[in-house]
Amino acid sequence: MFLQNKNVVVMGVANKKSIAWGCAKALKDQGANVIYTYQNERMKKQVVKLADENDLLVECDVASDASIQAAFETIKNEVGTIDGLVHAIAFAKKEELSGNVSDITRDGFLLAQDISSYSLLAVTHYAKPLLNPGSGIVTLTYLGSERAIPNYNMMGIAKASLETAVKYLAFELAADKIRVNGISAGAIKTLAVTGVKDYDQLISISNERTPDKTGVTIEEVGNTCAFLVSDLASGVVGDIIYVDKGVHLT
Protein backbone atom coordinates (compact mmCIF):
# COMPACT_ATOMS: atom_id res chain seq x y z
CA MET A 1 0.00 0.00 0.00
CA PHE A 2 1.63 3.22 -1.18
CA LEU A 3 -0.21 5.62 1.18
CA GLN A 4 0.29 3.71 4.41
CA ASN A 5 -0.32 5.99 7.42
CA LYS A 6 -0.57 9.12 5.27
CA ASN A 7 -3.13 11.73 6.34
CA VAL A 8 -5.28 12.94 3.45
CA VAL A 9 -8.12 15.47 3.62
CA VAL A 10 -11.08 14.77 1.33
CA MET A 11 -13.53 17.60 0.69
CA GLY A 12 -16.84 17.15 -1.11
CA VAL A 13 -18.29 13.76 -0.19
CA ALA A 14 -22.08 14.08 -0.60
CA ASN A 15 -23.15 10.42 -0.77
CA LYS A 16 -21.97 7.01 -1.94
CA LYS A 17 -22.21 8.08 -5.60
CA SER A 18 -19.86 11.04 -5.15
CA ILE A 19 -16.58 11.06 -7.03
CA ALA A 20 -15.09 12.29 -3.75
CA TRP A 21 -16.27 9.06 -2.14
CA GLY A 22 -14.56 7.07 -4.89
CA CYS A 23 -11.40 8.99 -4.06
CA ALA A 24 -11.77 8.37 -0.33
CA LYS A 25 -12.24 4.64 -0.86
CA ALA A 26 -9.17 4.39 -3.07
CA LEU A 27 -7.08 6.36 -0.58
CA LYS A 28 -8.16 4.04 2.22
CA ASP A 29 -7.42 0.99 0.08
CA GLN A 30 -3.84 2.26 -0.15
CA GLY A 31 -3.55 2.70 3.61
CA ALA A 32 -4.32 6.41 4.01
CA ASN A 33 -6.00 7.95 7.02
CA VAL A 34 -8.83 9.94 5.47
CA ILE A 35 -10.07 13.15 7.07
CA TYR A 36 -13.47 14.26 5.78
CA THR A 37 -14.81 17.78 5.68
CA TYR A 38 -18.50 18.60 5.39
CA GLN A 39 -20.31 21.85 4.68
CA ASN A 40 -22.97 21.75 7.40
CA GLU A 41 -24.88 19.42 9.72
CA ARG A 42 -27.16 18.23 6.92
CA MET A 43 -24.18 17.11 4.84
CA LYS A 44 -22.48 15.63 7.90
CA LYS A 45 -25.30 13.10 8.21
CA GLN A 46 -24.42 11.74 4.76
CA VAL A 47 -20.69 11.55 5.48
CA VAL A 48 -21.26 9.77 8.80
CA LYS A 49 -23.06 6.98 6.92
CA LEU A 50 -19.93 6.32 4.85
CA ALA A 51 -16.99 7.09 7.11
CA ASP A 52 -15.44 4.59 9.50
CA GLU A 53 -16.14 5.07 13.19
CA ASN A 54 -12.67 6.42 13.97
CA ASP A 55 -12.39 8.74 10.96
CA LEU A 56 -12.02 12.45 11.67
CA LEU A 57 -14.90 14.61 10.39
CA VAL A 58 -14.48 18.39 10.33
CA GLU A 59 -16.97 21.09 9.40
CA CYS A 60 -15.74 23.36 6.61
CA ASP A 61 -17.86 25.75 4.57
CA VAL A 62 -15.62 26.92 1.73
CA ALA A 63 -17.73 30.06 1.30
CA SER A 64 -16.26 31.29 4.59
CA ASP A 65 -12.58 32.00 5.20
CA ALA A 66 -13.18 31.75 8.94
CA SER A 67 -14.70 28.29 8.52
CA ILE A 68 -11.78 27.11 6.38
CA GLN A 69 -9.25 28.48 8.86
CA ALA A 70 -11.05 26.84 11.79
CA ALA A 71 -11.24 23.53 9.93
CA PHE A 72 -7.51 23.34 9.31
CA GLU A 73 -6.75 24.44 12.84
CA THR A 74 -8.85 21.50 14.02
CA ILE A 75 -7.06 19.16 11.63
CA LYS A 76 -3.69 20.43 12.85
CA ASN A 77 -4.69 19.88 16.47
CA GLU A 78 -5.96 16.37 15.77
CA VAL A 79 -3.37 14.92 13.36
CA GLY A 80 -0.54 17.46 13.14
CA THR A 81 0.43 17.39 9.49
CA ILE A 82 -1.19 16.10 6.31
CA ASP A 83 0.12 14.46 3.16
CA GLY A 84 -2.63 15.21 0.69
CA LEU A 85 -5.76 17.18 -0.09
CA VAL A 86 -8.63 16.25 -2.40
CA HIS A 87 -10.81 19.20 -3.48
CA ALA A 88 -14.06 17.94 -4.99
CA ILE A 89 -16.29 20.96 -4.46
CA ALA A 90 -18.30 22.89 -7.05
CA PHE A 91 -21.57 24.78 -7.26
CA ALA A 92 -23.54 26.91 -9.68
CA LYS A 93 -27.17 27.94 -9.63
CA LYS A 94 -29.25 25.60 -11.77
CA GLU A 95 -30.59 28.49 -13.84
CA GLU A 96 -27.02 29.49 -14.75
CA LEU A 97 -26.29 26.12 -16.38
CA SER A 98 -28.78 26.18 -19.26
CA GLY A 99 -30.07 28.87 -21.60
CA ASN A 100 -27.90 31.67 -22.94
CA VAL A 101 -24.45 32.21 -21.52
CA SER A 102 -24.94 35.94 -22.04
CA ASP A 103 -27.86 35.79 -19.59
CA ILE A 104 -25.72 34.59 -16.68
CA THR A 105 -26.16 37.01 -13.80
CA ARG A 106 -23.32 38.79 -12.06
CA ASP A 107 -24.28 37.21 -8.74
CA GLY A 108 -24.51 33.76 -10.31
CA PHE A 109 -21.12 34.16 -11.95
CA LEU A 110 -19.45 35.27 -8.74
CA LEU A 111 -21.06 32.50 -6.69
CA ALA A 112 -19.97 29.75 -9.09
CA GLN A 113 -16.43 31.08 -9.29
CA ASP A 114 -16.23 31.47 -5.52
CA ILE A 115 -17.31 27.94 -4.64
CA SER A 116 -15.95 26.07 -7.66
CA SER A 117 -12.62 27.80 -8.29
CA TYR A 118 -11.59 30.30 -5.63
CA SER A 119 -12.24 27.72 -2.92
CA LEU A 120 -9.22 25.74 -4.12
CA LEU A 121 -7.01 28.79 -3.54
CA ALA A 122 -8.57 29.50 -0.15
CA VAL A 123 -8.30 25.92 1.04
CA THR A 124 -4.70 25.65 -0.15
CA HIS A 125 -3.81 28.85 1.71
CA TYR A 126 -4.84 27.35 5.04
CA ALA A 127 -3.71 23.81 4.27
CA LYS A 128 -0.22 24.78 3.13
CA PRO A 129 1.37 25.05 6.61
CA LEU A 130 0.16 21.51 7.36
CA LEU A 131 1.27 19.86 4.11
CA ASN A 132 4.41 17.74 4.31
CA PRO A 133 7.00 17.81 1.51
CA GLY A 134 5.94 15.29 -1.11
CA SER A 135 2.25 16.00 -0.59
CA GLY A 136 -0.24 16.09 -3.43
CA ILE A 137 -3.28 18.31 -3.95
CA VAL A 138 -5.91 17.03 -6.39
CA THR A 139 -9.03 18.76 -7.67
CA LEU A 140 -11.85 17.59 -9.95
CA THR A 141 -12.79 19.14 -13.27
CA TYR A 142 -14.66 18.20 -16.47
CA LEU A 143 -14.36 18.43 -20.25
CA GLY A 144 -16.83 21.32 -20.24
CA SER A 145 -13.92 23.53 -19.23
CA GLU A 146 -12.51 23.38 -22.74
CA ARG A 147 -15.49 22.48 -24.92
CA ALA A 148 -18.96 23.97 -25.10
CA ILE A 149 -21.11 21.30 -23.46
CA PRO A 150 -24.89 21.88 -23.62
CA ASN A 151 -26.45 22.87 -20.28
CA TYR A 152 -23.06 23.23 -18.55
CA ASN A 153 -22.64 26.94 -19.18
CA MET A 154 -21.52 28.60 -15.96
CA MET A 155 -19.87 25.50 -14.57
CA GLY A 156 -17.77 25.17 -17.71
CA ILE A 157 -16.48 28.70 -17.20
CA ALA A 158 -15.77 28.00 -13.53
CA LYS A 159 -13.96 24.76 -14.32
CA ALA A 160 -11.76 26.58 -16.85
CA SER A 161 -10.84 28.99 -14.07
CA LEU A 162 -10.17 26.09 -11.71
CA GLU A 163 -7.80 24.41 -14.18
CA THR A 164 -5.81 27.62 -14.55
CA ALA A 165 -5.64 27.90 -10.77
CA VAL A 166 -4.14 24.39 -10.71
CA LYS A 167 -1.27 25.50 -12.92
CA TYR A 168 -0.46 28.63 -10.93
CA LEU A 169 -0.70 26.82 -7.60
CA ALA A 170 1.53 24.05 -8.93
CA PHE A 171 4.14 26.61 -9.92
CA GLU A 172 3.98 28.28 -6.51
CA LEU A 173 4.05 25.15 -4.37
CA ALA A 174 6.72 23.27 -6.30
CA ALA A 175 9.36 24.99 -4.17
CA ASP A 176 7.79 23.35 -1.12
CA LYS A 177 7.75 19.93 -2.83
CA ILE A 178 3.95 20.00 -2.96
CA ARG A 179 2.30 18.94 -6.21
CA VAL A 180 -1.03 20.23 -7.54
CA ASN A 181 -2.96 18.45 -10.27
CA GLY A 182 -6.49 18.04 -11.57
CA ILE A 183 -8.54 15.10 -12.79
CA SER A 184 -10.92 15.67 -15.69
CA ALA A 185 -13.44 12.96 -14.91
CA GLY A 186 -15.99 11.62 -17.34
CA ALA A 187 -19.72 12.11 -16.88
CA ILE A 188 -20.91 10.05 -13.91
CA LYS A 189 -24.37 10.10 -12.33
CA THR A 190 -23.52 12.00 -9.17
CA LEU A 191 -25.60 14.44 -7.13
CA ALA A 192 -23.83 17.30 -8.90
CA VAL A 193 -24.55 15.97 -12.39
CA THR A 194 -28.26 15.56 -11.68
CA GLY A 195 -28.44 19.35 -11.50
CA VAL A 196 -27.61 19.52 -15.21
CA LYS A 197 -30.59 19.65 -17.57
CA ASP A 198 -30.99 16.39 -19.55
CA TYR A 199 -28.18 14.81 -17.54
CA ASP A 200 -29.26 11.29 -18.52
CA GLN A 201 -28.71 12.22 -22.16
CA LEU A 202 -25.33 13.73 -21.31
CA ILE A 203 -24.21 10.52 -19.60
CA SER A 204 -25.60 8.34 -22.39
CA ILE A 205 -23.83 10.34 -25.11
CA SER A 206 -20.63 10.34 -23.06
CA ASN A 207 -20.74 6.57 -22.64
CA GLU A 208 -21.33 6.08 -26.36
CA ARG A 209 -18.22 8.12 -27.12
CA THR A 210 -15.91 5.93 -25.06
CA PRO A 211 -13.93 3.45 -27.16
CA ASP A 212 -15.37 0.51 -25.20
CA LYS A 213 -18.87 2.04 -24.92
CA THR A 214 -18.85 1.96 -21.13
CA GLY A 215 -18.68 4.87 -18.74
CA VAL A 216 -15.99 5.60 -16.20
CA THR A 217 -16.65 4.77 -12.54
CA ILE A 218 -15.97 6.66 -9.32
CA GLU A 219 -13.56 3.86 -8.41
CA GLU A 220 -11.49 4.46 -11.55
CA VAL A 221 -11.35 8.17 -10.83
CA GLY A 222 -10.49 7.39 -7.22
CA ASN A 223 -7.57 5.16 -8.17
CA THR A 224 -6.06 7.97 -10.24
CA CYS A 225 -6.60 10.37 -7.35
CA ALA A 226 -4.74 8.06 -4.95
CA PHE A 227 -1.85 7.87 -7.42
CA LEU A 228 -1.68 11.66 -7.80
CA VAL A 229 -1.65 12.19 -4.04
CA SER A 230 1.18 9.71 -3.60
CA ASP A 231 4.93 9.87 -4.16
CA LEU A 232 4.43 7.68 -7.23
CA ALA A 233 3.29 10.84 -9.03
CA SER A 234 6.36 12.87 -8.07
CA GLY A 235 6.94 13.83 -11.70
CA VAL A 236 3.36 14.95 -12.36
CA VAL A 237 3.02 18.67 -11.65
CA GLY A 238 0.32 21.11 -12.78
CA ASP A 239 -1.39 18.63 -15.07
CA ILE A 240 -5.01 17.85 -15.86
CA ILE A 241 -5.33 14.08 -16.17
CA TYR A 242 -8.26 12.73 -18.18
CA VAL A 243 -10.06 9.85 -16.50
CA ASP A 244 -13.03 9.59 -18.86
CA LYS A 245 -12.48 6.28 -20.70
CA GLY A 246 -11.33 8.24 -23.76
CA VAL A 247 -14.29 10.59 -24.30
CA HIS A 248 -11.87 13.50 -24.81
CA LEU A 249 -10.37 11.74 -27.84
CA THR A 250 -13.36 12.48 -30.06
Swiss-Prot record:
Keywords: Fatty acid biosynthesis, Fatty acid metabolism, Lipid biosynthesis, Lipid metabolism, NAD, Oxidoreductase. One of its GO terms (molecular function) is enoyl-[acyl-carrier-protein] reductase (NADH) activity. The active site is at 142 (proton acceptor), 152 (proton acceptor). Inhibited by triclosan and its diphenyl ether analgues. GO terms for biological process: fatty acid elongation. The record marks 197 as: Involved in acyl-ACP binding. The keyword RNA-binding does not apply. Pfam families: adh_short_C2. SUPFAM superfamilies: NAD(P)-binding Rossmann-fold domains. NAD(+) binds at residues 12, 18-19, 39, 61-62, 89, 159, 188-192. This is Enoyl-[acyl-carrier-protein] reductase [NADH] FabI.
